[in-house]
Each structure stands twice: as structure tokens, then as C-alpha cells.
Amino acid sequence: MDKHQAEKRLKELRLLLEDYGYHYYVLDTPKVPDSEYDRLMNELLQLEADYPDLVTEDSPSVRIGGPPAPSFKKVAHRVPMMSLSNAFNEEDLRAFDRRVRQAVGEHVSYVCELKFDGLAVSLTYENGKLVRGATRGDGTIGEDITNNLRTVPAIPLRLKQPYSIEVRGEAYMPKASFERLNEAKEQAGEEKFANPRNAAAGSLRQLDPKIAAKRNLSLFAYSIGEVEGKNVQTHFDSLMFLKELGFKVNEEAAECETIEDVIAYTEKWSERRHELPYEIDGVVVKVNSLADHEKLGFTAKSPRWATAFKFPAEEVLTVLRDIELNVGRTGVVTPTALLDPVLVAGTTVRRASLHNEDLIREKDVKLGDTVIVKKAGDIIPEVVGVLTDKRTGEEVDFHMPTECPECHSVLERLEGEVALRCLNPKCPAQIREGLIHFVSRNAMNIDGLGEKVISQLFLHQLIADVADLYLLEREELLQLERMGEKSVDNLLAAIEASKENSLERLLFGLGIRFVGAKAAKTLAYEFETMERLQEATFEQLLAVNEIGEKMADSIVSYFQKPEVATLLEKLANAGVNMTYTGPKKAAIAEEAGVFAGKTVVLTGKLSQWTRKEAQEKIEALGGTVTGSVSKKTDLVVAGEDAGSKQKKAESIGIEIWTEEQFTQAVEQSEQ
């Protein structure tokens, strides 16, 4: 066979194998016996080995996995992968329905989908070809796991139509595959996976794609992040469109005309969840109309047009052996039950929350009791009851201490609170927990500074507050356990990079009581510098939208502390950014002009700008960039092949600019 014949045969084999794979893995209707599929795959592999220059990125052979990667790159999601609000009972669902109808009117229909217990991923296609696959990460930044996702047979390497589209889905491991994997691990003397979700996530985060390829993973596609050239009206239509493109879409998704239909759907699958060949932990309820999605919008964390109904958590019995006390970064002392290990909802549980002293007293919890453990929301185990009839008389009463278990300061209960607090600002536990919060993903996001490293730094007295992180030296870090030269260099680089973080990240990282990520962003925008915020009065803070009396009082009290002034001075001297770097109100009013207060949509291919660069320019000049066109859109910037967004803008009379007009406007604004 010459090269020309080989090229022709390879095309035939790829088409055949793609079609057979689609029918087997997506439609569950095999066209040929496994032996025939294997024969064709072996022929493909042999031809590609003979003619390596004819191997393509979308060949079915990539399902087998390529060479290991040195690490996973961080990638930004163009459209954030937000989490969903939760509903735990019928009343929560009815409250969600009321909020939706109040916002968009009485005529609302929903789509119910099973909530798969796996790993959320984003798949990006350009002209129908898979170019990137990423984990959800924190919703804004994920990890590039493209090579591993290529090994999942249910993920099309090339779509049935050449769309440029971002698709969201859930990668999961079927129950049967999970059981086979754990049997193999047990025989090999290796630690077994706790549940299919952990197995799926662990498989896709292997640096060697060949490992992921052997794990028999699958994927259900459930939404579209972005698409060019296609306009669908409802969420259910988008699911059907994904099916047309070749994705595996769950057959149990259903349109529900009323909230009563939604409740019936959740009850049905709550009872029948164990009949499925894969794990689910609830039902996702979405408003069907995409126009209503636009009207409802988003909170800081989640869309208002969707909610996740969580199934009632499993409850099991075990013995409470001891109660451990933990001091958090705000000084709250939390009791935690230490239990005989027990399997709850697929996870081995050894510890469970007891919340506070009042709950211990109310439930009459004693050491040695047989207790009921429940996984609230299938995430956090908690003790919900005691079986007093199982007592033997050997159980021991538990009393909360009067002193902090870490620094031995007297514990106090503040007015209106049930929690006991340590009010000593120099309490080692509070400082340690504050450091962990400061470096966390939503705060300063310093890679390589986990709890174990921070505990070592604290133990060796290398740090006493968050500012000391910026004074760490290479030789000091090399003395720590499991800190080699590469790890130390990476850590120091991450610490250095964090100096350029936004003011809102720093504010959130400081751990001011009642100031969450959203409030930190508001404060940074309103006051623009740390110095102005330090000087802000209670009245000035209260005048800011979303800042209530409790938060205003907490902020004023925080900045009045002498140790806080010292800390901020140390941070500033270390070079940590103390200034708001986003679009400033004064700049928007005086300079931005053209984008001030405007909602802008970018569509099509831009030749002079990347999409990210254009978005940053618009935001720096006072505008807001969104991903879809609606009546709230003020301006559409259309590049080449703009597609449906430009047509929609034209149909509703929204101003449209060419890339040249956009570039001129930016240049004039910057003169």
C-alpha cells in the first residue's frame, strides 16, 4: 500500500470508527460486534504507525491516550461556569417558582434534568473541531485537561456540523466501571476510590492520558456556554441541538409546564435514583425560555433562572468516640464529632459537625453515644440525633471549655450569638486559619501554600501574619519538609505574582468579618484605595449600596485596630497592590465617554484584538461586556463572520460597530 492509498484508507477507517463509536457510546445502539470495532481500530493504529505524518488530532486513535503532560495549564472560561443555588425540599422549589414568576410573569415552563455526580467540564470547538477541554475550577479559571478528555468516547472530537461552540457537561464514571476499577485496585493492594465521582475526577486529573483512557469514562452534555451562528429559543431546544451535533444528552431530561410537574419529577427520581447505571445527587431545574434567562440574570454566585434540588441526604448510625474543638479565623470555637468510620452517601465519614454548644445540649450528646449522622446536601456530615435507648450507662457527659483550646484566653459569647469565641487577636489558631484564608483561591490565590505548608511556616516561626509571607527567603523555605528547589522557586514566584492582585482580592483575603467576595469588590470600587477605606466613617460606609449596619460597624472596628494599621503598612512596603485597578467612577465620567455605563457584546473574529484584550479595553473605559444580545444591550462590536448575534442586534435596532470603529473609539479615548 502506497502513501496515497494509506491516506484514503485512513479516511475511511476514521469515518467508520467515529460512526460506530457514536452509536455505541452515545446512542447505546451498537452497529457492529466489539471484535469488528477492535479489528478496524488495530488497522487504523498500524497505518498511523506506518505513516505518522498522516495522524490527525481528531483521529479515533487519540482515545487511547498520548504521552504524559508535565502539568496542567490554567485557562480562563470566556463565560463563567457558575454554581447553582440549592433547594432541599418542596417549599424551596415553590419559593424558587414564586421568585421566577414575580420577575417574568405567570406563564413559565421548566426543564428538569438529572444532576449527575461527576466532574463539570467545558469543551470548546472551533469550526466543529475540539480544541480545548477544561475543568470548572473556581468557575472563572479552570485547568486544561484536553488530552484526557479526548480519551472519553462520548465526547465528539469533531462535531456533525462545523459550529464554533463552547459546551458544558458532566464527565462521570458508570457504576459498573467504578466497581471493576475498585476490584482491580483491591487486587493490586492499592487504595480504593471512595465513590464514582472521586474516581472520575481523579482519572481526568492524571498527567498521563493513557490512565484516563483505561477508566471507561463517559459524559452527558447539558448546556451551551457560547455558540456562533445558531439561535435557539429554549433550553430544551439547546439540548436537542447538542444531540444533533453528536453529544450524549441524557434521555431523562423533561419539559415541565408547572412547578407541580417539577415536584413530581424530583419525587420520581428521588425514589428511583439507585436504578440508574450512574450516580446522581439531585435534579437541576431550569427556566425553559432563554429570553427569560436574560430577564432573570445572575447573582454574584449563581443564575436566578436555575436551581439544584438536592435529594434528602442518607442517614446512618455510628458511635461518637470524642469531640474535638477547632478555632476558626474569626475566633469561633466549633465542636466536631470524632466517629467510628461509616459509609454515608458513598463516602467514608470519620468526623461530623456538631455546630455549637447549644446543639450538643439540646440533643443531649454524650461521648460513647450511638448517633445518627446525615450528610447535609450530600456534602457536610453532621450529627442530627442520638439513640438514647442504646445507652449502656458508660457514656460520658461533654462540657464546652471556658478557655480557648489554643491560647487559653477566656471564651465569650457575644450578644445575639450561639457560638463561643476567642477574642484574642494573637491566638495562634486564628492567625493560622487567617493565613489559610488569605492564600485561598478566592482571595490572594497563592499556589503551593496549602494548610500543611502554612502550618510548617507557623511552627518554625517564619510567619506571624499575612505580610510575613512577602518576607520569606529561599533558604528558609528549603529547610521545610518536602520543599525542594523547584517547589520553593514556584512558591516564591506565586507569592511575588500575588502582589499584583486586585484590591478586592486583598480586602477579601484580610478576612474582615461580614465582608465576603462581593462586598469586597463593592468596597474596592467605591473607595478606590486602601487608605480611603481605612479613613471611611460609619456613615460613609452605610451610604454604599449593599453595605448594612453590621458590616459598616465591623469595617470601622477593624481599621481602628493598631495592629491592622501595622499590618497594612507592612503589606504596602512589601509592594502589595493597595489600589483599585478596575474602571474607576471618575475615569468613567470624565474619560470613557463612549463606553461609560454601556453594555457591549463582542461577536465574530477580530483581527487587531484578541477577545480578552477587547473586553479589558471596554471594561477599563467604563463598559460591561456580556455574551448575548438582548434589549439591554447598547452596542455590538461585529468582526468577521459575526453570525446570529449581529442579526439579532439588527432586528431589535441595536447600534452595531465594525472593528475599525471600535479601534478608533478606543484610540480617541486614550489620547
UniProtKB/Swiss-Prot annotation:
Residues engaged in binding Zn(2+): 404, 407, 422, 427
EC number: 6.5.1.2
Any one Gene Ontology molecular-function term assigned to this protein's record: metal ion binding
Reaction(s) catalysed (UniProt annotation): NAD(+) + (deoxyribonucleotide)n-3'-hydroxyl + 5'-phospho-(deoxyribonucleotide)m = (deoxyribonucleotide)n+m + AMP + beta-nicotinamide D-nucleotide
UniProt KW keywords: DNA damage, DNA repair, DNA replication, Ligase, Magnesium, Manganese, Metal-binding, NAD, Zinc
GO cellular component, one term: cytosol
Biological function: DNA ligase that catalyzes the formation of phosphodiester linkages between 5'-phosphoryl and 3'-hydroxyl groups in double-stranded DNA using NAD as a coenzyme and as the energy source for the reaction. It is essential for DNA replication and repair of damaged DNA.
Protein name: DNA ligase
Organism annotation: Shouchella clausii (strain KSM-K16) (Alkalihalobacillus clausii)
